[in-house]
Amino acid sequence: MLTAEEKAAVTGFWGKVKVDEVGAEALGRLLVVYPWTQRFFEHFGDLSSADAVMNNAKVKAHGKKVLDSFSNGMKHLDDLKGTFAQLSELHCDKLHVDPENFKLLGNVLVVVLARHHGSEFTPLLQAEFQKVVAGVANALAHRYH
């Protein structure tokens, strides 16, 4: 998946990421850009507009939770399937989340990282992160196979 050099680059960069801010924005953007994903979050209250979603405290809190899990995965890049096994089971068996949504969230996360980190988020770093988010999405979808 990733070379040792790529792992060093993504983990080094990840230390600069403000997980609470990036997580909140990434989940919020997912819900706005792909509104059908909102069906999993109806209990979060008002999701009636982009502003409502982006300012929703429950969306922000869950976005941080999602990125906390992603951060854990960043510590275990060689065992993403093992790291995300329980979350894969939860999302497959109990929540019935379409695994395609994991790919969508990964792509939104890359957009948010680029927005927050500007020129520091180079095309090469983006390519490396695309590998990471694809690996995480694959690990989360593992239970579906």
From Swiss-Prot:
Keywords: Heme, Iron, Metal-binding, Oxygen transport, Transport
GO molecular function per UniProt: haptoglobin binding; heme binding; hemoglobin alpha binding; metal ion binding; organic acid binding; oxygen binding; oxygen carrier activity; peroxidase activity
Domain of life: Eukaryota
Similarity field: Belongs to the globin family.
UniProt name for this protein: Hemoglobin subunit beta-A
InterPro entries: Globin (IPR000971), Globin-like_sf (IPR009050), Globin/Proto (IPR012292), Hemoglobin_b (IPR002337), Hemoglobin_oxygen_transport (IPR050056)
Transmembrane segments: none
Coiled coil: none
Domain Globin positions: 1-145
GO cellular component entries: blood microparticle; haptoglobin-hemoglobin complex; hemoglobin complex
Record function comment: Involved in oxygen transport from the lung to the various peripheral tissues.
Keyword hit for Heme: yes
GO biological process, one term: hydrogen peroxide catabolic process
Binding site residues for heme b: 62, 91
Summary of the tissues where the protein is detected: Red blood cells.
Subunit organization: Heterotetramer of two alpha chains and two beta chains.
UniProt KW Ribosomal protein keyword: no
